[in-house]
């Protein structure tokens, strides 16, 4: 996980970098009253955002995919194995160790996802994330509404 690549090495296709938590999936410590439970591991209940497979199928005609999550590697591997993400190839999978750790004004730890070292052509890269302020450069991020496990049609309507 976390190999550096140049976008120009990806068959001249565009790159769609995907965040996981609250963008494509939601995990909860107890079962939710709505939503489609995909998997359970220990105290984690995993919910996949509706229309994820349709979105990825639609985007795969023009984009290569990568994952960048501020979560730990074992958790990210579990998410990929447990969801439709396992059916797709990824140019890279970055986790918390690839993020820059910063402290917010209130003392909370936040993790910045800096795409700059990974790309040479910014116009060919888009990131989908629910917290675009944590992505550098900011201009390449599409904000996804926070997903909390229930009914949702964002991925059905967002264009690639």
Residue ranges with predicted function:
Residues 2-5, 9-12, 49-54, 110-115, ...:
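Eukaryotic intrinsically disordered and solvent-exposed regulatory patches
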Residues 12-25, 55, 61-64, 89, ...:
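Core residues of folded domains in eukaryotic genome-function proteins
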Residues 52-80, 96:
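Substrate-recognition element of Asp-dependent hydrolases with the DxDx(T/V) motif
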Residues 74-160:
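C-terminal cap/substrate-recognition subdomain and adjoining C-terminal extension
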Residues 11, 18, 41-52, 65-69, ...:
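Amphipathic alpha-helical protein-protein interaction segments
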Residues 6-9, 37-46, 60-65, 144:
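Short interface patches used for recognition in eukaryotic signaling and trafficking proteins
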Residues 1-20, 29-34:
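Non-catalytic pre-domain segments flanking phosphatase-related domains
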Residues 25-49:
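Metal-dependent phosphoesterase signature
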């Amino acid at each position: 996980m976390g190999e550096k690549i140049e976008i120009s090495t990806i068959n001249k296709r565009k790159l769609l970098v995907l965040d996981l938590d609250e963008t494509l999936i939601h995990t909860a410590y107890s079962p939710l009253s709505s939503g489609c439970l995909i998997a359970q591991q220990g105290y984690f209940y995993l919910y996949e955002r509706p229309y994820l497979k349709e979105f990825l199928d639609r985007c795969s005609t023009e984009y290569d995919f990568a994952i960048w999550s501020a979560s730990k590697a074992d958790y990210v591997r579990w998410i990929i194995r447990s969801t439709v993400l396992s059916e797709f190839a990824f140019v890279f999978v970055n986790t918390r160790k690839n993020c820059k750790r910063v402290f917010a004004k209130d003392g909370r730890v936040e993790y910045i996802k800096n795409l700059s070292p990974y790309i040479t052509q910014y116009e060919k890269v888009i990131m989908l994330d629910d917290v675009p302020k944590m992505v550098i450069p900011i201009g390449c991020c599409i904000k996804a509404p926070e997903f909390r496990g229930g009914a949702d049609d964002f991925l059905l309507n967002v264009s690639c």
